[in-house]
């Protein structure tokens, strides 16, 4: 029923229901985990009206661009919910998130495609650009053979973040996949990772990386 509710409220431009609440909560928390400076109020204003409150302090243009990109990525996720999770679908999620971000485009980052330059998570080396496609294919092949469970989803997410397939936006696309899959399958319950749980969440990913080298 939740998927139908999302679709109905989105079509009606309803800003008072569960669709708008989830859009705001997910965009705020997922971007905040990555260092966004926008508040819940600013996030709500952007989603509801496409503007920021008049009396606001300074804010970073990139934070606004990524917040708007997150709203678009959520809508794309809803539109493609019945499709199988594929590399192309994940790349398109990344495109929705990042195509309007000036800084990423100015830096020559691949948008909607896998990274062209090596990147790291702290001191941890992620998959090299030349290996990303193979590792992503193996990960998706593995995932589609699993019984759908929170355990399989958690392992998928940890492996995805360890690969770090994109130049930037890996956490946000990864958490959107978590939400998508938990929304899609009856065996699972949809959830949002909160910024309040950031340290526990990052610690869990770190633990996985260290024990599954």
Regions found by a protein language model. Name each.
Residues 1-213:
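FIC/Doc superfamily catalytic core
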């Amino acid at each position: 029923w939740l998927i139908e509710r999302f679709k109905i409220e989105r079509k009606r431009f309803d800003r008072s229901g569960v669709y708008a609440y989830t859009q705001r909560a997910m965009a705020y928390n997922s971007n905040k985990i990555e260092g966004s400076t926008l508040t819940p109020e600013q996030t709500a204003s952007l989603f509801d009206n496409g503007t920021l409150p008049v009396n606001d302090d300074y804010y970073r243009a990139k934070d606004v661009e990524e917040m708007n990109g997150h709203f678009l990525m959520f809508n794309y996720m809803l539109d493609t919910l019945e499709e199988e999770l594929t590399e192309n679908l994940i790349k398109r999620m990344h495109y929705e998130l990042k195509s309007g971000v000036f800084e990423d485009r100015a830096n020559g980052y691949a948008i909607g495609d896998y990274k062209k330059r090596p990147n790291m998570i702290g001191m941890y080396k992620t998959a090299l650009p030349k290996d990303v496609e193979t590792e992503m294919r193996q990960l998706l092949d593995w995932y589609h053979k699993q019984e759908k469970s929170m355990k399989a989803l958690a392992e998928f997410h940890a492996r995805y973040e360890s690969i770090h397939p994109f130049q930037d936006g890996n956490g946000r696309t990864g958490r959107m996949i978590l939400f998508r899959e938990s929304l899609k399958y009856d065996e699972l319950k949809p959830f949002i990772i909160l910024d309040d749980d950031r340290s526990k969440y990052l610690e869990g990913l770190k633990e996985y990386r260290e024990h599954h080298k």
